[in-house]
Regions:
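Short S/T/G/P-rich N-terminal loop/turn motif that feeds into the first structured element of a domain
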Residues: 1-49, 53-69, 76-97
């Protein structure tokens, strides 16, 4: 069963432009994951949210250490704070109907 990790982040200096966010994602080594997808979106001037979709809970758990290291670096580099995080199995998905 696919597994999702949702997060919300606070940017003290404001959320960067889409191009800057894409550059941050590329810099963070997005290719260094087995996630099926990583999606970031802006919700206001100082917050963005993200969704990571993994093939399974086991794989999400195996990548937890890598995620934590990347988050610590991102916090230091971008002056951001994790506001909330939720994880769980994906119960339904339109693309799989």
């Amino acid at each position: 069963m696919k597994f999702a990790v949702y997060t919300k982040w606070y940017w003290k200096n404001g959320v960067p432009t889409p191009a800057e966010l894409q550059a941050n994602m590329n810099k963070a080594g997005s290719g260094d994951t087995t996630a099926e997808d990583v999606i970031w979106w802006k919700i206001d001037e100082n917050h963005h949210q993200s969704l990571i979709i993994y093939p399974s809970e086991k794989i999400a758990e195996e990548e937890l250490g890598k995620r934590q290291v990347k988050r610590e670096k991102s916090r230091a580099d971008n002056n951001i704070e994790l506001v909330e995080e939720f994880m769980g199995p994906i119960m339904s998905r339109l693309t799989e109907l």
